[in-house]
């Protein structure tokens, strides 16, 4: 449930980049929706990420593999899909299934890079695990730093709109006293800059993971960021009357089964204000990292990849919040890659790409071989799109989510979805618990489920996409362990 930005300093032969081995700055932002000005959100004030997007390639159709923190982060770092690593919840570590997996940072270390982490790259329970190693993978790093700021000591001040739930999952927020640098994410930026300053003089290049905790709940940021978003300007997303009537029950996350958590509109608007405030706060920390790259004379030998672990609902479909769905808002995720002197820099890419593509992209750019073993990486390099964002691609994206049995569902249900340029097809329990089809050419907000009363064209599309989906994702509940309370 987070957002990631990856900055990589890499060597490139025959594509115009520096001949020396590049450094990698890998920045992850938690729970970041594409609610950024560079992605067309006119409310957001995100000048630093916007500037990064303008200097790199902004992927407008990038999709995560499972919109929940632990599975998606494990998938990115291993380059493997959830069905391969058997991670669907917040408790299972990918090494339980693939103990010999070679992670992205491990591959760089094996080829002469120093690899370190500041903050959240793998899963953390937020805010409980802030200041610890969280659900880390020790073989992935040579050094780790786990800052803990005043947001931890100020937790008793946080407003919780849903007191019956923990602040980790509830709509909760705090307009905090103090400076950016006192907050955990401000400290993360500070520590990352210190490491870059030290490592710039080392003989070995660095791969530095920088993981920010916000805008994950609770939405905590200094007061000045809340002031940037007057409450009068906050509007909840439009949804037509009866929007939910054609949507299967399983499509709604078990932790958000009723519209807006039954909260009133004013409270939801305050939550929206708080989300945008934390978004701008994290944007400022990204700006500090970018400024440090310039100041330390590292920018020309650094690739930047900015991404979040998944998308995020902000009230769409008449009251969906947070993640854990297969709708566009949860599956689609920010992804920006800036490679020095890449021909595609400054251009947006509308091709369909997946987060399993990040790993092979970075190894390709660095001229590294992917790890050998019984399991091959399951994505493909985006290097051709960094050269020419308009290049032919023929991409599809697969996203899954596992539902526990509850009052709504008599038994667990696997959901899986495939996104093409025009269509999104989703089925639940292989169709036994519902099917969805949305035509993004006519219905980009996914209001009209064509699978309910399909015409001949819709029937043909569903048949074709179901076959493609079955090739890459199981519709069955896994036989490996999972914790129903942590899905």
Question: Where are the regions that the model predicts?
Answer:
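C-terminal tail/extension regions appended to the core domain(s) of diverse proteins
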Residues: 472-473
């Amino acid at each position: 449930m987070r957002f990631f930005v990856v900055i990589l300093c890499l060597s490139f032969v025959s594509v115009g980049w520096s001949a020396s081995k590049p450094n990698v700055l890998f920045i992850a932002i938690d729970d970041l929706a594409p609610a950024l000005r560079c992605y067309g959100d006119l409310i957001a004030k995100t000048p630093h990420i916007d500037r990064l997007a303008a200097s790199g390639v902004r992927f407008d159709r990038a999709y995560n593999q499972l919109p929940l923190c632990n599975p998606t982060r494990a998938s990115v770092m291993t380059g493997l899909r959830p069905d391969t690593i058997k991670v669907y919840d917040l408790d299972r570590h990918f090494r339980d299934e693939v103990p010999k997996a070679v992670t992205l940072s491990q591959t760089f270390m094996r080829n002469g890079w120093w690899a370190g982490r500041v903050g959240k790259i793998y899963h953390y329970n937020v805010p409980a695990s802030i200041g610890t190693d969280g659900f880390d993978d020790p073989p992935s790093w040579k050094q780790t730093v786990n800052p803990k700021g005043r947001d931890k000591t100020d937790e008793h001040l946080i407003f919780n709109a849903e007191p019956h739930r923990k602040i980790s999952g509830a709509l909760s927020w705090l307009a905090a006293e103090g400076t950016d640098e006192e907050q955990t994410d401000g400290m993360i930026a500070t520590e990352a800059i210190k490491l870059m300053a030290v490592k710039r003089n080392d003989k070995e290049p660095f791969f530095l993971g920088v993981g920010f905790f916000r805008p994950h709940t609770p939405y905590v940021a200094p007061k000045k960021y809340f002031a940037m978003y007057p409450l009068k300007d906050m509007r909840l997303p439009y949804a037509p009357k009866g929007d939910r009537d054609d949507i299967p029950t399983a499509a709604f996350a078990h932790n958000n089964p009723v519209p807006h958590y039954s909260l009133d509109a004013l409270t939801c608007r305050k939550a929206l204000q708080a989300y945008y405030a934390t978004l701008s706060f994290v944007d400022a920390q990204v700006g500090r990292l970018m400024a440090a790259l310039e100041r330390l004379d590292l920018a020309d030998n650094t690739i930047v990849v900015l991404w979040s672990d998944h998308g995020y609902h902000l009230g769409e479909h008449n009251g969906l919040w947070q993640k854990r769905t297969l709708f566009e808002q949860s599956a689609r995720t920010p992804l920006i890659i800036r490679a020095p002197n890449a021909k595609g820099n400054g251009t947006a890419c509308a091709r369909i790409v997946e987060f399993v593509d990040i790993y092979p992209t970075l190894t390709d750019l660095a001229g590294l071989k992917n790890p050998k073993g019984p399991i091959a990486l399951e994505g493909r390099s985006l290097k051709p799109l960094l050269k020419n964002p308009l290049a032919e691609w023929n991409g599809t994206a697969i996203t899954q989510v596992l539902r526990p049995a509850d009052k709504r569902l008599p038994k667990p249900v696997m959901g899986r979805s495939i996104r093409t340029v025009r269509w999104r097809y989703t089925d639940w329990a292989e169709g036994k618990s519902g099917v969805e089809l949305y035509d993004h050419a006519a219905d980009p907000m996914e209001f009209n489920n064509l699978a309910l009363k399909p015409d001949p064209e819709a029937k043909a599309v569903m048949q074709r996409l179901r076959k493609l989906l079955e090739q890459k994702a199981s519709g069955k509940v896994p036989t490996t362990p999972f914790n129903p309370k942590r899905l």
